[in-house]
Amino acid sequence: MAEADTERRPHIPVLLRPLLAAVAPVEGTWLDGTFGAGGYARGLLEAGADRVIGVDRDPLALKMASGWAGDYGDRLRLVAGTFSQLDSHAGAPLDGVVLDLGVSSMQLDLAERGFSFQKDGPLDMRMSQEGESAADLVNTASEESLADILYHYGEERASRRIARAIVEARAAAPITRTLALAEIVARCLPRPKPGQMHPATRSFQAIRIAVNAEFSELVEGLEAAERALRPGGRLAVVTFHSLEDRIVKRFLQLRSGGEGQGNRYAPETRAYAPRFTLPLRRAISPDEAELAENPRARSARLRVGVRTDAPAGKVDPQALGTPLIPKKGRR
């Protein structure tokens, strides 16, 4: 029932109109690396793209798209996979890449996927529905590792207090439900005032990022987009929180000419020809009309880069400000 309800509910892609305007003209072959409910892919096809490759690691997203994807014939190809390997999914140089980061509305709305702290469901949070779940992490990670994850991936100042409460709670019984975890976190923090975010927001974000390795996926995906785009090809990335937005912002800054500025910590830094140009002076945020239509868009930011003909290369995740968890063992 939940799946059917989500399929009927119209999907509102965040910042679609400004994205299409920023990457115009839309033509040739595009890759939507976070296909989800297909809103960006449809928008690109209707705006003039000859072909769109839709990539998603969530098998449910691709299953739900099977009912309408055939309407576009061979103009839309769906691929099960991650956007960190988008260049291998493309098979040929691309005219554009779109990435809509984080958890999708579909995943949030389905309680059984375990992403929401407002709906009771199994503590899962796996986008691919494979591998270690959030329950596995919460019930087996050491208190120190949990605190590191909450602090570095969620910017949660009360990380140690929350980690201690989790360890104490799981000693009595395994934590297997989303609302159970949300209540443990909420008891560690002051009651929010009207209009403030739910106290479990940062903790759920952090655990989700850890379960899905979202930051390494993002860095590798940006590198893959650089390899896959032809000269003049567009990269458009929509972010939803400051940590991932910082990574995208620094990537585009460095790849558009910020490299080669050596310092006493990296005196051997070489200068490279810019791999991207930046058509936007700053990130685009939703306007009031979009926020009224889709309140979930409030934290969204759109950044765009245009590929040059300079050779692609590797990037240092630390140079992008990627949060790193100290390597001292999880268990």
UniProtKB/Swiss-Prot annotation:
Molecular function, one GO term: rRNA (cytosine-N4-)-methyltransferase activity
Claim: Lipid biosynthesis is one of the keywords in the record: no
Catalytic activity: cytidine(1402) in 16S rRNA + S-adenosyl-L-methionine = N(4)-methylcytidine(1402) in 16S rRNA + S-adenosyl-L-homocysteine + H(+)
GO cellular component: cytoplasm
Binding site for S-adenosyl-L-methionine: 38-40, 56, 83, 100, 107
Region Disordered, residue ranges: 289-331
Cellular location(s): Cytoplasm
Keywords: Cytoplasm, Methyltransferase, rRNA processing, S-adenosyl-L-methionine, Transferase
Pfam families to which the protein is assigned, alphabetical: Methyltransf_5
InterPro entries assigned: RsmH, SAM-dep_MeTrfase_MraW_recog, SAM-dependent_MTases_sf
Entry's EC annotation: 2.1.1.199
Gene3D superfamilies: Putative methyltransferase TM0872, insert domain, Vaccinia Virus protein VP39
KW Coiled coil (keyword) present: no
GO-annotated biological processes: rRNA base methylation
PANTHER family to which the protein is assigned, alphabetical: 12S RRNA N4-METHYLCYTIDINE METHYLTRANSFERASE, S-ADENOSYL-METHYLTRANSFERASE MRAW
UniProt similarity note: Belongs to the methyltransferase superfamily. RsmH family.
Function in brief: Specifically methylates the N4 position of cytidine in position 1402 (C1402) of 16S rRNA.
Protein name: Ribosomal RNA small subunit methyltransferase H
Organism of provenance: Cereibacter sphaeroides (strain ATCC 17029 / ATH 2.4.9) (Rhodobacter sphaeroides)
